[in-house]
Each structure stands twice: as C-alpha cells, then as structure tokens.
Amino acid sequence: MTVTPAFITDRSELDRFFSQLPKSRNSDAIIISSFQLMPAMHDKLQAIDLPTVGVNVPAESGYFDASISIDNSSAMTMAVRLLRSLGHTNIAFCSDYIPADMVYNTSQRTQAFADAAQANATDGITFSLLTADAHDAPLSKSDLASQLTAKLLSLPERPTAVCVETDQVAIALVKELRKQQLNVPEDISVLGFDDAEIAQAADLSTIRQEPIELGRIAGRKVLQLLRNEPLEHPHELQDPLLVLRNTTSRIDSGAAPAE
C-alpha cells in the first residue's frame, strides 16, 4: 500500500484539495487526520466512491466510513482527577486559536476538559479555558506560549495547574513560565498531551496516545473497506495513558498562589 501525504493547515487549503479531487483521482481511499469533514466534502467523497477513514477525528463527526481516535473524554477526565488528587482545584486549559470554519480534534479536547472539570465542580474544582487570539498565519510555539502565559498570569487568581493541548505547546509554556520566575512544578504544574518523543527529553508529564498503532488500525480499516469486508467495529477509541514525569507535583497546601 502506497501512502501519499497532503498537508492542510486552513480552510482555503482544504477547499482547494477537495476542488481538485475529482480531477486528480489517483487514490483508492483517503485517510483524514484530526479535523472534521464538512457535509459537502462528505457528499463529494461518496459521489466518487472513495472510502474515507478518520484518524483522531471529532467523535460527533458521522462523515467517515470508519475511524480510530484517542478517547479525549477519558483522557481529560484522567487529567482532571490526577491534578485534583495532587491538591489542585484551580486548573486551566491552554490551546491555540482554531478558526470558526474548522473543527479539529483538539476542539473536542477543550470541551472534554471543560466537561470533566464541571463534573468535578462539587469537589471544589474551578477552571479556565485560555485560547490564543485570532491569527491568520501560524504562530511559533514560543510566541504562542508567550501569549498564553500572559493570559494565564492575567487571571484574577492564578491557576496552580495547567493542561495543554499538545506536548509542543506545553514545553514552550514551561519555558515561558520559568522566564516569568515561576517554578514548574513547585509553583504551577503542567500536563501535556501526546507523549511525543520530545516530551521524554523535556521530562514533561503528559497523556500518551499511540500514533503508530492509530496508523496501523486505520490502514487495516482501509484495506477492509477496499475489499468490501464488513467492519466489526467501524469506529473505535484508543485508551489514553497518563505518563507522570517532572512537571506535575502535589500542591503545597500552605502556599497561596500569587495574585
């Protein structure tokens, strides 16, 4: 099986790809990672009989023949419960800006965090959702972390723990927090998402997903669809795993967060 990648970063690139699809029909199937299909795009794929498999696509999608995704709901529930068990009750979630005309897997991650925090509100949890300001061109991770840190430190009461949408952003955030004379994890705990190779090098606590296994499962689903074989479980979720390293710790109950 030969795989040809196409990189799409915004709605205009997505529209361009789908407008050219009927003319460049040199594929037997398509795997879409991390974002939601629009109804018109789904209809176009059906019209040209192109099997479509999603990897880490929003759960409410419904526009894929099959899918395999990390269980964001379970992951965020684990994250909130972990931080609560360490004594944290004021927790933030930090993410990049997502244009209104795109729906990414990380959009669902943000909502899953909010749902998990609300479910634990009776246990004293309060939370903040911090998102970068709107921007047309992608921000560097350093600039993104700088903006998110400014928002974090501008809150009426600084959170003692932060969940971050990806490891790359989390690592940049840790660096920026330390530039602002905050110790991680003594003053503020930081939890990433992915467990990318860089997370281990940075000693970052995170939530692990298995991208290679996600790809293998997606590939098997593609082959089954091409052979017209029935899929016993067309849509599957991968269980996340907490990985504890050196950016999360128990809060000092005697210390009040800086205002």
Role assignments for model-derived ranges:
Residues 1-4, 29, 46-54, 58-259:
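Bacterial carbohydrate/catabolite-sensing allosteric modules
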Residues 38-46:
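Active-site-adjacent beta->alpha loops and helix N-cap segments on the catalytic face
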Residues 37-39, 169-170:
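Glycine-rich nucleotide phosphate-binding loop and flanking beta-alpha elements
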Residues 13, 42, 252:
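Short acidic, gly/pro-rich beta-turn/loop elements at beta-sheet edges
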Residues 1-37, 57:
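Central regulatory/effector-binding core of bacterial HTH transcription factors
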